Amino acid sequence: MSAFTPASEVLLRHSDDFEQSRILFAGDLQDDLPARLDTAASRAHTQQFHHWQVLSRQMGDNARFSLVATVDDVADCDTLIYYWPKNKPEAQFQLMNLLSLLPVGTDIFVVGENRSGVRSAEQMLADYAPLNKVDSARRCGLYFGRLEKQPVFDADKFWGEYSVDGLTVKTLPGVFSRDGLDVGSQLLLSTLTPHTKGKVLDVGCGAGVLSVAFARHSPKIRLTLCDVSAPAVEASRATLAANGVEGEVFASNVFSEVKGRFDMIISNPPFHDGMQTSLDAAQTLIRGAVRHLNSGGELRIVANAFLPYPDVLDETFGFHEVIAQTGRFKVYRAIMTRQAKKG
């Protein structure tokens, strides 16, 4: 990760202003500017495990990954540089959390792409750190203000829930399909066979809805769930608990923290990383699945029909089949055979 995002390029136009600052970087940290900008001291807090992986290699313990930042994460910082995400409720959660910890008088910078809705930062922070726009370039806005009043932050107030066929789904800001079950997941669920047994891995688990729905009609499966997102990991744990389903849930960059092999891997893989379309995770999922499937095990994923997954599936497994499709989505199935092991 060396190329800077447009938001970071805008910040670099002001790099002289940051040389004496003790900076906390937070929000949608899609590059390694926090590790490379010349400052008096730098810390970073992220809810994205893959962003933490990159930053921690260069920043060590000064890069932190968690759902909620703590006093230790912001210690000694006099400046916040916040990268605005595409999701406004996610920004609200993170900013209220961070501003409740930082001392009054902290310099606050918010930067983001115009299409991500960064302008709404002004209204969001009006009562705490009134912002002014100080730069506009690369289709991004940079805003500056000073923290005048700490907000009260209560993470519990950000939880939401909805029901799907009698199942309770717990959600948090930034979790995929936060307001209801997406069409792709519905299609994938329709293909799952009742009374399935064995070890099942749900990659990119989101709020955990695929796993709890699968477990309801296949109670003998043993579930493992993972996601890069701290909100997703916590939401999945809560969804499992709310439905009395057991399973292991942890943060992982696709298979980075996954141990062992499974009889089935299911996923509705992401193809957006922040505002950037990215197929990397799905391709890593397909190619890496052969190292985590038992012989005869299967990978079953749902994806937008236009995405180029058939070629990667055939390269990796030797073949694939489409077991369900609509105009927009396809469910792909590939089986772990000797042919696949050579791939």
Curated annotation (Swiss-Prot):
Function, as annotated: Specifically methylates the guanine in position 1207 of 16S rRNA in the 30S particle.
Enzyme Commission code(s) on record: 2.1.1.172
Organism: Escherichia coli (strain 55989 / EAEC)
The protein's name in its UniProt record: Ribosomal RNA small subunit methyltransferase C
Superkingdom of this protein's organism: Bacteria
One example GO MF annotation: nucleic acid binding
Residues in coiled coil: none
Subunit structure: Monomer.
This protein's GO CC annotations: cytoplasm
Subcellular location(s) of the protein: Cytoplasm
InterPro entries: DNA_methylase_N6_adenine_CS, Mtase_sm_N, rRNA_ssu_MeTfrase_C, RsmC/RlmG, SAM-dependent_MTases_sf, Small_mtfrase_dom
Gene3D superfamilies (alphabetical): Vaccinia Virus protein VP39 (3.40.50.150)
Keyword line: Cytoplasm, Methyltransferase, rRNA processing, S-adenosyl-L-methionine, Transferase
Family (UniProt): Belongs to the methyltransferase superfamily. RsmC family.
Catalytic activity of the protein: guanosine(1207) in 16S rRNA + S-adenosyl-L-methionine = N(2)-methylguanosine(1207) in 16S rRNA + S-adenosyl-L-homocysteine + H(+)
Main EC class the enzyme belongs to: transferase
Source taxonomy: Bacteria, Pseudomonadati, Pseudomonadota, Gammaproteobacteria, Enterobacterales
Record-linked Pfam families: MTS, MTS_N
Keyword field contains Ribosomal protein: no
